[in-house]
From Swiss-Prot:
It comes from Sinorhizobium medicae (strain WSM419) (Ensifer medicae). This is Large ribosomal subunit protein bL25. Belongs to the bacterial ribosomal protein bL25 family. CTC subfamily. GO terms for molecular function: 5S rRNA binding; structural constituent of ribosome. The lineage of its organism: Bacteria, Pseudomonadati, Pseudomonadota, Alphaproteobacteria, Hyphomicrobiales. The keyword RNA-binding applies. This is one of the proteins that binds to the 5S RNA in the ribosome where it forms part of the central protuberance. HAMAP family: Ribosomal_bL25_CTC. Residues 1-21 are annotated as: Disordered. One of its GO terms (cellular component) is cytosolic large ribosomal subunit. Keywords: Ribonucleoprotein, Ribosomal protein, RNA-binding, rRNA-binding. The keyword Ribosomal protein applies. The gene is rplY.
Amino acid sequence: MSETYELKAETRERVGKGSSRELRRNGLIPAVIYGDKQPPLSIALSTKDVTMKIHAGGFMTTVATIDVDGKKIRVLPKDYQLDPVRDFTMHVDFLRVKKGSQVSVQVPVRFENEEKSPGLKQGGALNIVRHEVELNVSADNIPEFLTVDLTGLKIGDTVHISNVELPAGATPVITDRDFTVATIAGRTQEVEETEEVTEVEGGEEEA
């Protein structure tokens, strides 16, 4: 689990596009805290502080504390919007979380020991099907990432979610199947399949 942190915020009295633009001009980000059967709370945060946390990594999997005018609220980031042109943070949504509460989180997947995979050594390719896995997990036990060990994997092998070690008490949101996280594909096979498709398409055009 990533190390928690605290952000200072102030309550927003006004909402709407005009108010949000004014906040951004003053170096602040509009945000909302919702959940826990309480009314949504509109707040403003330092653009610099939030941007630093986002770029540091683990932002969406780290429980934080927001000090709103002296009142500390425990939250988990659920969404944020970036300006498509200038790439700065436009808005953030936070979910209130209590101690031990269950949350649904998209957790990044990391792959290790590629050099110990016979399939990759033979020229195979790591085909990543899921870069993230959505988990139901305690807010106090959210992993920063899930680790997939590629040791011993050969061409044609598949890594299913059942092969991935999850934190205690965590379960995948998808429960109706043992879904694929990654496979070791053969490059030669991929080339042959591409050539076959090209030949078929060429034959159809001639016909």
